[in-house]
């Protein structure tokens, strides 16, 4: 019984706090005071370097796609970069007849408007450049044949490398 009373008291306090805070925010808005969002949108470049040959590479690819989607859905600016052995994933995901279980996640990113780029040099080094070029995908060679990470940092992006 004592626990139920404590729980009810905590619930009541939380309800009162929410009501008071809501009233303060409403008053501020009515007075023309800008109310900042809880979190300003950020900028992220998610760089997938892991290849297709291992369980770890699969996990990194899953998380690169998952993090990209979540950040985009929360209003952040996100760029997905396929670099190193990660260019193999770009080749797999863009096959017209791909049946890989991660391909639907990749295609969903296109619907969300995520920018995707592929390292030109690494696509060649990992033997997928010709197929990617035939599909007219964005092969980028800004710095020594690779995408420039300085460019993204200069534009305020945070890098997440998987």
Which residues does each predicted region cover?
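A short aromatic-anchored loop/beta-hairpin motif
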Residues: 108-109, 126-147
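Histidine-anchored nucleotide/phosphate-binding helix
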Residues: 59-74
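Short internal beta-strands
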Residues: 68, 79-84, 116-120
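A glycine-rich helix N-cap at a beta->alpha junction
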Residues: 96-128
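Bacterial N-terminal signal peptides that target proteins for export
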Residues: 10-21
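Boundary at the C-terminal end of the N-terminal hydrophobic targeting segment
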Residues: 38-40
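Short, glycine-rich nucleotide/cofactor-binding loops
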Residues: 45-62, 90-94
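C-terminal segment of classical bacterial N-terminal signal peptides
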Residues: 27-35
